[in-house]
Structure formats: C-alpha cells, structure tokens
Amino acid sequence: MYETILNKYATNQISYYVEDMESFARAHSALFGSGPFLYMDPTTQTVDYRGQQIELTMSTAFGQFGDLQIELVQVLSKPNPYEELGHYGFHHFSNWVDDFDGAIKQFAEVGFEPLFTMTSGGGLRVAYIDLTSVYGHYLEIHAPVVKPFWDSIAAAAKDWDGKDLWRKLGA
C-alpha cells in the first residue's frame, strides 16, 4: 500500500456515543470480550463546533478489543457534536496524522470539513472530520503523541481475566 497523509497509521480506535457508559461497556464486553474499560470523570472544555465556541461537558471511557481501542463518550451538555447523527451508537473512528493542518487541508480539498476542533490542555489538537454525506460517520484525527496513553489502555487488557470490567482511570 502506498503511504498518504491519512494511512501512515492504521485506524486505531472506534468511538461510540452512548447514553450510559457503564451499561454499554458491560454489554459490549459480554458480546465481544472487550475490556477492561477505564473511565474518566466528566470534564468541560471549550471547543469549536461548526464555527461556534461552545462549552462541551462529557465523560469518556476506554477499553480494548484486540488491537483496537474502544472509546465510549457520554455527553452531558447541549449543543454538542455527538447528537448530530440523531442516535446513540457508532460515531467515529480515529486515525493519527503527523501533519494535522495538512490533513485538514486534504479533507477540505475533497469537500469534507471539520465538525469539531479542540486543543486539549496538553496542547493536543483534535478534529472530527464530517464524512457523513458519503460514509455516514465522522473521523477523528490528531497526532500520535497520545500513543503512550493508548498503550496503557492496551496494557490493562493484556492479561485481563474478564473481571473488574469497570475501573476509574488512575485509581
């Protein structure tokens, strides 16, 4: 496969917009054997949502399904970029990019604009590209600097025995 700005790193996460993270995690684990799931308390961040600055409050949890990270997002504020699809369930997959601005530009050149952008407290730039008109979902892009965190989620799953599914991150 030839390398492009978007395929250097494989898709490494799928994300679900959920009403109740713990219930979803338990159902996903029971069916697929995914887990354990490490959750974070709600946080509020100022984000750009379709050109408007909003305060987004949400909780997240992360689990593992083979080599794929599973992210669960429970949103506690409105408006928000998760409810646009009109239902709970699959929301986006994630790909790392070395050139964030170049990726945004490449998507714009073929008609796909960001639904949402933000910069984390640690300086990580994140965007959800709106691919719904063609693919029915969004794509999250950001730099691979998150790899150590993602590796820690995978490490929690490595020798997991199926018990203690729901854990507070950092506890």
Predicted regions and their residues:
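Short Pro/Gly-enriched beta-strand edge/turn motifs at strand-loop
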Residues: 41-47, 109-113
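Glyoxalase I/VOC metalloenzyme domain signal
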Residues: 1-12, 16-38, 52-111, 130-171
